[in-house]
Amino acid sequence: MKGIVLAGGLGSRLSPLTKVASKQLLPVYDKPLVYYPLSTLMLANIREILVIAAPNQIERFSDLLGNGEELGLCISYKVQMKPAGIAESLILAEEFLDGSKSALILGDNLFHGSGLGRRLEAFNEIEGAQTFGYHVQDPSPYGVATVNDDNMVTALVEKPKYSESKIAIPGLYFFDETASCRAKELKPSKRGELEILDLLRSYLDDLLLNLEMLPRGTAWFDSGTFDDLHEAGTYVKLMQERTGERVGDPLEIAKIRGWVN
């Protein structure tokens, strides 16, 4: 299992800050945002990781993370010339994956919860695709899943104006080794992008898509706006003060797992 952090995008809702820095490099309390998705992959026991970023930002990520050696990781980098959809990341990562299963996480998503790492680690031997669900009040900003009484996915809709389902799909996905080939077969959407929901539908059509609700007590933040960044930062500060434990700290995770001294 290898990991992909998609740290591209224009971050237009965070302008003017994103005119000088990728949003994934902006601070969430005491750490850059990208530390949090990187930590999630590490909690899933994934140590080979590809960071995908825009041409004018890739060097900054490399300056921050290096080759991963200090974290017990092997980190490499790939340029995404322009935002062309989340699913394109599986195409860009094809050489890196080299037939491996993969975990894809969006660089602006923060996950935190007791036992989350152990749960995610269970998907390292996945057959098909694994996505997750999170109950939200307003699903309109997200990809949304409809499930039946057996918790099987019956429909996937991108940013619906109205939806009876309140199950948002967070930016974390596990795929088998066919993901890159499936992504290359997708056609661009009306907005000219290779959509992640279309990739998930490819698995759904083959009865190979599974959805699991994130464990009770898990927090998820999609940090795309100033309010989102503030809310996520407030959460991190509160949790660290309450528990005395660091949230989203790659070095601490590496030490706990014995990857570094």
Predicted regions and their residues:
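A structural signal for short hydrophobic beta-strand segments in well-ordered beta-sheet cores
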Residues: 25, 145-147
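Conserved donor-nucleotide/metal-binding helix-loop-beta segment in metal-dependent transferases, i.e.
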Residues: 113-141
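Catalytic-core segments of class I nucleotidyltransferases/pyrophosphorylases
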Residues: 103, 120-121, 152-254
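Short, conserved catalytic or adaptor-binding loops enriched in Gly and charged residues
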Residues: 66-72, 147, 202-204
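Conserved N-terminal catalytic core of the sugar/cofactor nucleotidyltransferase
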Residues: 2-5, 13-16, 26-27, 31-106, ...
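Short aromatic/basic micro-patch
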Residues: 27, 173-174, 259
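A short acidic, often aromatic-flanked loop/helix-cap motif at beta-alpha or helix-coil junctions
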Residues: 83-86, 138-139, 162, 219-220
